[in-house]
């Protein structure tokens, strides 16, 4: 019996999401979650909400326009949270972040269900300039969440240290 690379990668995504949601739960348990979500570790640095929303919006972009050429959900949020965006001071609530993470993951899983391991070498039109295959992109998405969850986690710890 062989297990597909797509299934293995989805399992890694699940573990990463558990860690991301644990960080979000820790924030939600604090006395003023919105204040925590808007806290920045330094001038011009990304706040916690941006780190978490960026995870979801990136997955939404890959699930739609980057893999299959469709329009992403959250068209109003994409410019605010896609890679290269500048974090603004309009801080989303915990429930909004949780919904974006859940829905974008569902969209990504739905898109991935249309692929087989034999499709992993395909380079979608939207990723040609980066020469990024579906297989490489799904591995990068696993790294991407862990990277930004780690940034959110250390930012939360810095917030706690600064506000004891």
List each model region and its residues.
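Short, contiguous alpha-helical
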Residues: 10-14, 18-21, 33-82, 125-164
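Low-complexity, compositionally biased segments
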Residues: 28, 62, 91-93, 160
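Short acidic/polar alpha-helix capping motifs at helix-coil junctions
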Residues: 1-2, 72-73, 85-89
């Amino acid at each position: 019996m062989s297990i597909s690379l797509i299934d293995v990668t989805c399992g890694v995504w699940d573990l990463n999401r558990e860690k991301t949601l644990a960080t979000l739960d820790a924030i939600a348990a604090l006395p003023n979650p919105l204040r925590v979500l808007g806290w920045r570790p330094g001038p011009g640095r990304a706040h916690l909400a941006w780190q978490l929303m960026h995870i979801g919006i990136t997955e939404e972009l890959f699930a739609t326009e980057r893999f299959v050429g469709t329009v992403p959900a959250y068209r109003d949020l994409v410019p605010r949270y896609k890679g290269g965006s500048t974090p603004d001071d309009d801080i989303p609530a915990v429930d909004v972040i949780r919904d974006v993470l859940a829905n974008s993951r569902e969209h990504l899983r739905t898109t991935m269900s249309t692929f087989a391991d034999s499709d992993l070498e395909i380079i979608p039109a939207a990723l040609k300039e980066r020469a990024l295959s579906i297989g490489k992109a799904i591995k990068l998405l696993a790294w991407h969440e862990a990277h930004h969850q780690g940034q959110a986690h250390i930012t939360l710890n810095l917030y706690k240290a600064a506000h004891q």
